[in-house]
Amino acid sequence: DWVFDFPAGSALIKTFYYPIDERDPSAGKQLLETRLLLRKENGWEAVSYAWNKEQNEAFKKVAGKTINVAWIDFTGAERDVRYRVPNVNQCKECHAAEDKITPIGPKARNINKDFEFKEGNFNQLVYWMNREIIDEYPLELKSPVDWTDETKDINDRVRSYLDVNCGHCHSPT
């Protein structure tokens, strides 16, 4: 259940977006925010950037921002929501451990699956081990299932969803 110990100079980056039309992936995406966790010598720093309307540049938002987003859902209905880019202090609501900013997502079990690389399709953890990026990982690692995959057991799907989306706050540890 541990998160990797990243060296100083590491950057964890995640971009948030809404599809323009969920029925047509070729319609593109509306970029909203890119979040960075930057590993410094003395710990992690959280930084949020909000994308402009032209979708060609993002600007640092220390105080956060609210973005009105509209899209078409799978049924063809027009939807809208007020998306909130967190301010620096709000980042700590999820990413704090012992009063310090810390990553919560890059756990071995969450990336223990195959990805497409230039050299072919490989398990992410095996790929990292072969390149000496990591030394080891638990070989009997149980990874979450794709919660949208209706062929999977409903209990596994629910547990996977809750683990990935809720477990970092709602945890006995």
Name every feature range the model reports, one short phrase each:
Residues V3, E22-T173:
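Sequence context surrounding c-type heme c attachment/ligation sites in exported
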Residues F6-G9:
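Short, well-ordered loop/turn sites that connect or cap secondary structure elements
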